[in-house]
Amino acid sequence: MARTKNAGVPLAAEVVSQTINDEVVVASAAEVDSEATNLISNDDRADSDEETEALQPLKMYFGPSDYTKPFKITAKCYLHKAVGLLESHLEESELKWFLEHPQFKHFFHMHKDPNHKVMGMWLLFIRTTCLDKKGSMVYCQWRTDPMFGPGATIQYPDVEKKLLSMKKPSEARLRVVVLYFLCNRWKGVVADLELCKTFPWGKNAFEENYLAFEAIPVLRKNFCEDIESADPQCPRMCKMKFKSSTMKGFPMSDVYDKLGTTKSILAPTPDENLLLKRIMDKECGVNDVDDLIADGWKKRLVDEERTICFEPLFNEDVAHQSFVANNAPSTVVQAPRKAAVEKKGKGKTAAALTSPSDEGLTEVVNEMKNLMENGFKSMNKRMTNFSKKYEEQDKRLKLMETAIKSIQSSTGTDDAYGSKEIDDRENELEEGSDANGGDNEREVREKETEIDKEVAQGDNEREVGEKETEIDKEVGQGDSDIFDGNKDMELNKEVAESTIGVAESEKDKEVTESEKDKEVAESEIGVPESEKDIEVADSEKDKEVPQDDEMDGGKVTEPSKKRGKSHDDGDDPSEGCVKKPKVVKKVAKSRTDAKPVYRSPIQTRYARKKTKKNV
């Protein structure tokens, strides 16, 4: 275990050697091999010649080859696993030793959370050096323990296995328990149990250092909470815990959102100021050994506030931390140094130290060249394959284009031939229609007359059926006489109105005899229909006359029917009206004369044809 009070010497919390020893041996300067020191280089140059030069240490506690990873500070500890195993396997007397320990007891009664680990309890630094000065460095060396065999390399699973195999409580078992407890955190004083009690295990490293969740009020408020049942004499780690969450940890995005632009942290308390003064003050030198290396570092770092950089050690450390690709030898990266640095105010220059890693750089460059060449070769192969594929696709596209053009040309010629044939057929039909125009018109007229006959027959049959049903209804009525009288009055009025219309139509029709002759010729086809209509109208009773008028729609043939019925019944339509006798005479003439009689069915025929089309 290494520890220092000098600000320029880092804390150490881990030992590379994992063998066990019965004694604790403190190394001295005489035991350290005397080796020639390397050249020293400092970042800053003093304004005067009296500046203190930092000396390179004779030996580093951990060699460069012991660590292959870059510098890292860990902040996670799985305390709940070790504490749970000890509580379940130890006897009361053995467990009492931990519960009464001034530092270890807090691990057993603090809040145990498997997700949120205890952070910042101690710092792990890789680089530590061997010094003889008191208060600057404490470290332990071990010899092989007889329990694990001579020369055995002990690992963490071996310690756990050894602990579980020891069933009876004893001092040896307690030592193994202490070793198991410290394997994850400290590898140090195990043989001397009294020394474990008096040694300041992380006291200054924890009690006098604040975490971000403790120092920044915003983070403490949002992510931490106090434990009410904690002992007031316990340190902070027993009085605080992280808030429960559905996740194993807090995402950094949440931390950044809560933090925002906060720059406020806890100011140092008076006790902390006294502590800093006590740590940074000069040692009294009682029972102490002067160390030029430690004193030179302290004076340069604290008094002169300068930095120290040992370039050879830096290059050696980086060389062992570089990655290994494809089992290639590790390469060396030079430290970023200037070729020459001028002293302030004097203009003097100091030549830069030559780096021993030039060969490593050449190897890196050669490897990069080989990788680039191989990559470009593979890219060229792929590009050639792609070009071949594209050429094949171009050929296929050209073939498809030619096929599509041929299809389009063939379809265009077929359409031209088809349109010509259609035009020829239409011309032939037009010529035939012009030659046989009269025949076609006659055929059309004959078809129209046949259709009119069929329509007239259907209408007559429907009218006869409707009239019969109405007659049956009227026969059952008791007031048939009154109903007949009313019907006669209505018929007289309608006859008078219809005769006026007939007279006007006859005047218009008698304008030219040539037109009448043409109309008579056209109406000859409809004579049988008109005669049938007249006979049906004469054979019906007087009660059915209004219904005939309604069914026929007030056509020209209805007045003649109504007028004939009125004469047959003996009623004179001229009664009560001066103009009626003249109309009767005209009607009588129209009855004897065939011209007006033959004209009326033509109008009814065209009227029925229109109604049929509308339907």
UniProtKB/Swiss-Prot annotation:
A Pfam family found in this protein is DUF287
Task: Please list the residue ranges that the record marks as compositionally biased, kind Acidic residues.
Answer: 424-433
Q: Which residues carry this modification: Phosphoserine?
A: S48
* Keyword terms, alphabetized: Phosphoprotein
Q: Please give the residue ranges the record annotates as the region Disordered.
A: 424-615
Instruction: Locate the compositionally biased regions of type Basic and acidic residues.
Output: 439-476, 484-496, 504-521, 529-561
Q: What is this protein called?
A: Uncharacterized protein At3g43530
Q: What is the native source organism of this protein?
A: Arabidopsis thaliana
